[in-house]
């Protein structure tokens, strides 16, 4: 399918206004540019869950900023944890705010969006350590937050999808964490950058291969890019992982590694579902102001997470 016209215009506008590549800019400017990108014209107007509260979650190196979203104050919903994208170097709970509001309303889950330490100031394994610490704390403190006690749904997009996948893998041997299912949105799964979809050009996608290469160098200083702690695609054992929903996009350099991971999970006996959205780009679920598929993803997530909880959408 052809690239969605609204997304094609978005890419053209980005290219026309790019004066320097990210690695040529101060990291503060990179982060500001990412914040400024998410305008209401792209994200859509923010819906209003009844409850939106900023939190601080204990982390391994100090408190982690987080935000709780609940569609109703008078109901204890299950917890869904969300880790934002941004290539490990940018992004945060503010950039994902509109999406998490939509997610809480559609899924009838209490969504907790968690910040983690960013590279290059805090390289690997800081983000993994923060994700694990937050999942462990939330697994045992749902009641304090007014949510339903029970196993979590772990979710994330892009770099955050990587953190969710790695945390789910670690949780199998960590009794502090109870994970019911995982929702991975265009997740980073292969630091070797070797899948065929990496050939997509900058005029076809929002995150070309050279941007990914820079993100990975900022985050991970190790020589083994097949380490399961950064590349879940190369994990030697995937058995026993929680059920997974993996969402990919046709015009995304990460598309094929997502498809490969689905096959590996299926071979390991994991319940997994995957949808590749035609005509879409990386991060499209955040772009409700541009494409209707953004809401389709939220509804797909709601259908995936709710049967196991007995909640009717």
Tell me what each language-model feature is.
Residues 1-68, 310-313:
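A glycine/proline-hinged amphipathic helix-loop "lid/cap" segment
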Residues 150, 165-313:
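Alpha/beta hydrolase fold serine-hydrolase catalytic domain that processes acyl esters and thioesters
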Residues 139-154, 174:
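Gly/Ser-rich "nucleophile elbow"/oxyanion-hole loop immediately N-terminal to the catalytic nucleophile
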Residues 94-114:
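Short amphipathic alpha-helix adjacent to the substrate-entry channel of hydrolases
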Residues 58-60, 66-76, 233-238:
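Short beta-strand-to-loop junctions in surface cap/lid or active-site-entrance loops
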Residues 76-86:
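Short beta-strand element of the alpha/beta-hydrolase
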Residues 156, 160, 164:
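Gly/Ala-rich beta-loop-alpha elbow adjacent to hydrolase catalytic centers
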Residues 122-144, 301:
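Alpha/beta-hydrolase active-site loop
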């Amino acid at each position: 399918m052809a690239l969605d016209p609204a997304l094609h215009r978005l890419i053209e506008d980005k290219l026309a206004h790019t004066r320097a590549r990210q690695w040529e800019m101060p990291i503060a400017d990179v982060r500001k540019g990412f914040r400024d990108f998410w305008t209401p014209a792209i994200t859509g107007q923010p819906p209003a869950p009844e409850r939106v509260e900023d939190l601080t979650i204990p982390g391994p190196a100090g408190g982690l900023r987080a935000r709780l979203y609940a569609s109703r104050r008078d109901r204890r919903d299950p917890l869904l944890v969300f880790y934002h994208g941004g290539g490990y170097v940018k992004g945060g709970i503010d950039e994902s705010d509109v999406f998490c509001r939509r997610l809480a309303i559609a899924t009838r889950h209490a969504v907790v969006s968690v910040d983690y330490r960013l590279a290059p100031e805090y390289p690997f394994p800081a983000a993994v350590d923060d994700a694990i610490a937050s999942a462990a704390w939330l697994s045992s403190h749902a009641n304090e937050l007014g949510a339903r006690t029970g196993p979590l749904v772990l979710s994330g997009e892009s770099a955050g999808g990587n953190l969710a996948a790695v945390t789910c893998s670690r949780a199998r041997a960590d009794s502090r964490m109870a994970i019911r299912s995982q929702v991975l949105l265009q997740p980073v799964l292969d630091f070797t950058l070797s899948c065929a979809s990496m050939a997509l050009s900058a005029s076809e996608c929002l995150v070309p291969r050279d941007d990914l290469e820079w993100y990975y160098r900022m985050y991970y200083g190790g020589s083994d890019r097949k380490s399961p702690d950064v590349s879940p695609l190369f994990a030697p054992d995937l058995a026993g992982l929680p059920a997974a929903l993996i969402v990919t996009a046709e015009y995304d350099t990460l598309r094929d590694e997502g498809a490969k991971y689905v096959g590996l999970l299926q071979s390991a006996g994991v319940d997994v579902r995957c949808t590749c959205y035609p005509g879409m780009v990386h991060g499209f679920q955040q772009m409700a102001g541009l494409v209707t598929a953004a809401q389709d993803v939220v509804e797909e997530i709601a259908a995936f997470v709710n049967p196991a909880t007995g909640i009717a959408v």
